[in-house]
């Protein structure tokens, strides 16, 4: 097995999450993504460092009790992105296409199928608002 196949095999066998990250307060957009469970906070840090809006994890869907949890997580992520394609903020396949405009239907689906981060022992945010950020996202 070559290195690429070894990495793919390790990735697929890792416990994972489909995650929903909300941008803004109140939430204006939702990112639907997938990551290994051990990398969830690193993903949030990565996204927050390149986003001027406060980000927080709205919910996660854990995948861990199958032979290849990440493969199942990726399949679920694709299903959700397809289901909410009409809310996609950027053209499919381009940078940013994992971001969706918030809607009552999307938030209801997240509440229905997701688990709150606190229930998994995950912090929902890594930022502390500064003096230049009010509740409407600006001054």
PLM regions and their residue ranges:
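Non-catalytic accessory segments flanking enzymatic or RNA/DNA-binding domains
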Residues: 1-139
């Amino acid at each position: 097995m070559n290195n690429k196949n070894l990495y793919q095999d390790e990735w697929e066998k890792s416990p994972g999450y489909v995650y929903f990250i909300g941008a803004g307060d109140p939430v204006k957009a939702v990112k639907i993504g997938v990551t290994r469970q051990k990398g969830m906070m690193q993903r949030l840090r990565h996204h927050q460092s390149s986003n001027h809006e406060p980000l927080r994890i709205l919910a996660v869907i854990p995948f861990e009790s199958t032979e290849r949890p990440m493969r199942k997580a990726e399949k679920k992520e694709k299903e959700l992105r397809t289901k909410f394609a009409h809310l996609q903020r950027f053209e499919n396949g381009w940078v940013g296409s994992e971001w969706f405009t918030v809607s009552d239907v999307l938030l209801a689906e997240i509440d229905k199928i997701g688990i709150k981060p606190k229930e998994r022992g995950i912090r929902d945010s890594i930022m502390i608002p500064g003096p230049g950020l009010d509740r409407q996202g600006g001054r």
